[in-house]
Regions:
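Polybasic/polar functional segments that serve as interface/processing modules
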Residues: 1-117
Length: 117
């Protein structure tokens, strides 16, 4: 089974992908289009034109695991600008899964130190 705590590299395939592709098709896209290789620390994420569903491909050591998530309400904030493979940190992955953008502005503005009394 997949343990997301062991995943160190979250790769997001920016742009559109045909979500009718299964394990073999998505693995071929990763290897041929992006020139990347699978390991047990990497999870590859894909999104189609409808941004309410994504697929994730993970190599668990003895085979592939294909994960599929469809939102019942809302859409993923998926980057569409480039057809590239982008590496996300775990925080950006959590933001994406929670429906937020992966590039967040600063949530709390920096302040200046001041006297409290």
């Amino acid at each position: 089974m997949i343990d997301l705590r062991k995943v160190r590299n979250f790769y997001i395939a920016c742009g559109y992908i045909d979500l009718r592709l299964g394990i073999d098709g998505l693995a071929a896209v990763v290897k041929q289009q992006y020139g990347s290789h699978f390991d047990e620390e990497s999870l590859f994420l894909f999104c189609g034109r409808r941004t309410d569903r994504i697929k994730a491909l993970y190599w668990c050591g003895d085979g592939y695991i294909l994960l599929y998530k469809r939102l019942s309400n809302g859409r993923f904030q998926w980057p569409r600008s480039e057809a590239e493979l982008r590496l996300l940190d775990p925080q950006s992955f959590r933001w994406l899964m929670e429906g937020l953008r992966i590039e967040q502005k600063t949530a709390i503005r920096k302040g200046k130190p001041r006297d409290l009394f």
